[in-house]
């Protein structure tokens, strides 16, 4: 039986309360110490290790996904809850997946630009951001484009994301 919406997340939470991943993802052993931070990217390491929300961007294959998964693994080692959300893999499941996630310690969202023009997804992320602001859940968004290039239909969502500090991962 295929589960949809919050049923997937409920099942995941029950199976592993520390690090949450979607059931089709392979085991991930990414670690920040294995990522090469050169002089151009040293500030990024400090931001990753902070408690701040931020927006991460850069060309394809520079390590955005790796860094977010590494951060989720770090949170798991500290007995904190985290969730990596690969939007390209879950858009067809619907935005109800985002309900009640603000109780987590960290949410990393990959390819946030993919929700552009998808009204239900935009509203769900707007609500998630607002809920995380009050619950202290840390949010990290990533895309291959600079956040200044995001053009969401829901302008309140656009302004919330554009207010975040942004960091570009520069190729080595």
Where are these regions (language model features)?
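Short glycine-rich substrate-engagement loop in P-loop NTPases that contacts/grips substrate
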Residues: 76-106, 119
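Conserved AAA+ ATPase "SRH/arginine-finger" region at the nucleotide-binding site
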Residues: 164-172
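Walker A/P-loop nucleotide-binding motif
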Residues: 52-68
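P-loop NTPase Walker A phosphate-binding motif
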Residues: 66-79
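A short, basic N-terminal segment
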Residues: 2-47
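Conserved P-loop NTPase "ATPase switch" module shared by AAA+ and STAND
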Residues: 100-121, 128, 135-144
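Short regulatory helix/loop adjacent to the ATP-binding pocket of P-loop NTPases
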Residues: 147-162
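Conserved nucleotide-binding/hydrolysis micro-motifs of P-loop NTPases
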Residues: 88-91, 113-114, 139, 145-150, ...
